[in-house]
Amino acid sequence: MLHNIRIVLVETSHTGNMGSTARAMKTMGLTNLYLVNPLVKPDSQAIALSAGASDVIGNATIVDTLDEALAGCSLVVGTSARSRTLPWPMLEPRECGVRSAREAEHAPVALVFGRERVGLTNDELQKCHYHVAIPANPEYSSLNLAMAVQILAYEVRVAFLDRQQAAAPIVEEEEAPYPLVDDLERFYLHLEQVLSHTGFIRQAHPGQIMSKLRRLFTRARPEAQELNILRGMLTSIEKQDKYPQRGADGSEHNGKN
């Protein structure tokens, strides 16, 4: 299960933080590190501060975009303070660990950490199913990157051990599979295109409407089959003659022959 947990660092600017993160991960049994557009590449300082976790650094996956790091994941949790202009479903660290451990038994899970100074952007946070806030001392809440990783990695490990060491097998109601992040992004693109064509939103400025719709569907968290129904509804609207239809490659063409 732990191999399905991805620790994703976005635009890290200090190699020492990469090394300290690798150390924090390995102590909790996590090895899957993703670096999104790092401002510097891992170097000797990263290896030194990894303190024996150089294999985590050496095997890190370096990608250009957050979308690449999230590809194939069924659950994405982003670290954030609570004060955001657009509220989002929040988790406490313990609940984050429990949910991550449960879903990682079936599909990859990403825990996303932002830049050292400014964290994650609103656009990046909207790609997450949940946000997690670490309840630090409000008078001094300064956690460095590796500390934050250590806290969430610990919660994942505790939840993992609880599931492994339960006296009796954990019996849970069988859940239908959730769509992967890639499928959700295709749905949001499809939804925005259809709503633009119907005039419900302005194509040049989808802005707040799409943000609120993302929040709605994130909160509802539709299953894969339910998402297929929604896609089918959008396709049905597109089939009306006055709306362009999309080809397999996403290009648009008029529905009239």
From Swiss-Prot:
Please give the GO cellular component terms listed in this UniProt entry: cytosol
Q: Which InterPro entries match?
A: Alpha/beta_knot_MTases, RNA_MeTrfase_TrmJ/LasT, SpoU_MeTrfase, tRNA_m1G_MTases_N
Q: Which domain of life is it from?
A: Bacteria
Instruction: Give an example GO molecular function.
Output: RNA binding
What residues bind S-adenosyl-L-methionine, as annotated? T79, S80, A81, G114, I134, S141, S142, L143
Keywords noted in UniProt: Cytoplasm, Methyltransferase, S-adenosyl-L-methionine, Transferase, tRNA processing
- Could you say which enzyme class this protein belongs to? transferase
**Record field: catalytic activity:** cytidine(32) in tRNA + S-adenosyl-L-methionine = 2'-O-methylcytidine(32) in tRNA + S-adenosyl-L-homocysteine + H(+); uridine(32) in tRNA + S-adenosyl-L-methionine = 2'-O-methyluridine(32) in tRNA + S-adenosyl-L-homocysteine + H(+)
**EC nos:** 2.1.1.200
Write out the GO biological process terms.
tRNA nucleoside ribose methylation
Q: Where does the UniProt annotation locate this protein?
A: Cytoplasm
Chief localisation class: cytoplasm
NCBIfam families in alphabetical order: PRK15114.1, rRNA_methyl_1
Quaternary state and interactors: Homodimer.
Task: Spell out the family assignment given in the record's similarity comment.
Answer: Belongs to the class IV-like SAM-binding methyltransferase superfamily. RNA methyltransferase TrmH family.
Q: What this chain does, per the record?
A: Catalyzes the formation of 2'O-methylated cytidine (Cm32) or 2'O-methylated uridine (Um32) at position 32 in tRNA.
User: What protein am I looking at?
Assistant: tRNA (cytidine/uridine-2'-O-)-methyltransferase TrmJ
Q: Which gene does this sequence derive from? A: trmJ
